[in-house]
Amino acid sequence: MPKIGQKILIVDDEPDIVNLTESFLQLENYDTLTSNSGEEALKIIEDHYEEIMLVLLDIMMPHIDGYTVLEKIKSNKKYKEILVILFTVKNFKFDIIKGKELGADGYLLKAISGKALLDYVRKILKDHKEDDKKEEMEQL
C-alpha cells in the first residue's frame, strides 16, 4: 500500500473559507495546499499525490463538484489512500450517505469552530495511523 504524505489540501470555491481554514491548520503546524475549484484540485492531486495525506473538500463548486472530485480520488489506485473529509454547508442525510458511498472518510459542516475542525482532523489522521499499524501487524 502506498504511504500517504503530510500535506492537507483545502478545496473550496470561496477564498475566505480557504484562507480561514488554512490559518487554523497552519496554527497547528499542518502543511497546506489550497485550491478554489474541482479542476484545480484534481491537477494538484495529480502533481502532488505523494505529499497529500488529507483533502478537506467542499461539495458545492461550479463545473466539477466535490462528489466528482471525491469519486476520482477514490477510484484511482495512486490516490485512493488519500483521506477525504467533505467540508460543506449541506446537512441533508442524502449528502452524508452519498459521500460515504463514494468513499469519504468524514463529513464536517462549515459552521464549525476552528477548534472543532482541528480536533476532527486530528481524529481522522489518528484513526488512519492506527488502521495502518493494525494492517502492518496482520502482515507479519
Kindly give the residue locations of the regions a language model identified.
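C-terminal output helix
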Residues: 112-121
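Receiver (REC) domain active-site loop signature in two-component systems and cognate sites
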Residues: 61
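Charged docking surfaces used in two-component/phosphorelay signaling
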Residues: 19-27
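CheY-like receiver
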Residues: 129-140
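Short, glycine/charged-rich "phosphate-handling" switch motifs in NTP-dependent
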Residues: 105
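Acidic, metal-coordinating helix/loop segments flanking the phosphotransfer/catalytic sites
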Residues: 34-54
